[in-house]
Amino acid sequence: MKKKKIEKGSVQETLLLPLYGRKRAMEMYPGNFNDLDCQRIYNEVEIDYNRKGIMEKIGAIMAATRQYDLASVCRSYLKDHPRSCVVNLGCGLDTTFSQVDNGQARAYNLDFPDAIAVRNELLGERERETNIACDLNDLSWFDKIDFHPEDGIVFFASGVFYYFKTEQVKTLFTAMAEHFPGGKLVFDATKKKGLKNMLKTWLKDCDDNIGVYFSVDELSELKSWSSSFSSVIRKGYLTGYRPLDKRYGFVLNTVFKHLDKSCMCQIIEIRFK
């Protein structure tokens, strides 16, 4: 089969980067991560990120661990709500639903139109799965989710809210809590210090006032946003959902523990009343 050529600098290349991290993690640490969709996609495309060394190793571990964390939360929610909606906010080419699908849940994948176009091309829609092209800040997407409170709903976002301003996130989260009672939201976040380094590296044209972008220093501030939040908890991104693998090595595991302890790498879980 002829492989699809992925052009440098394209939307496809950007969306494939997180999958590359998971692919490399599976190759370096067999048995620790499992993403068959990721492997299949990379067998069908021709692309070379040319990333080697310690930074590739760190990026691969972090990308795969983040998916593991978010999948763990979704899987736990589905135990009590097997017919739940599973909503992927800013989905890109994320394949988490295939890791947690119980045969009853319904998936909704949300992203900008260009990202959804790539997703439709490389992944398509499967049974009980709907791809929705939208702007997350335009809350009209709420009405496209076939939500039934008795069935439940769980939202997850992987590497998404770093690029949102705090007021945008507050508006979105509070509206979600009102519209989807009994639901749950899980996402990754960092402190203001970590966000400053991240945005200066990734967003050359970001707002000069980096402080307006979303980060989580004090969990109490996030809790105060809405009386419709029943709980807000924070766990370590790298250590919160399972122990570190000894194969990562002493030095990297020490670094990972520090990142979690200092709250530079966080997973936030919000439960709606």
Region spans (language model):
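Rossmann-like AdoMet
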Residues: M1-V87, C91-C134
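Short, glycine-/aromatic-enriched active-site segment of Class I SAM-dependent methyltransferases
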Residues: K192-I210
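Conserved beta-strand signature within the Rossmann-like core of class I S-adenosyl-L-methionine
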Residues: V154, M176-K192
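Conserved catalytic loop of SAM-dependent methyltransferase domains
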Residues: F229-T254
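Core SAM-dependent methyltransferase catalytic element
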Residues: D245-K273
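A short, conserved alpha-helix within the catalytic core of class I
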Residues: Y163-M176
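Short amphipathic alpha-helix with an adjacent loop that forms part of the alpha/beta core around
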Residues: S140-E150
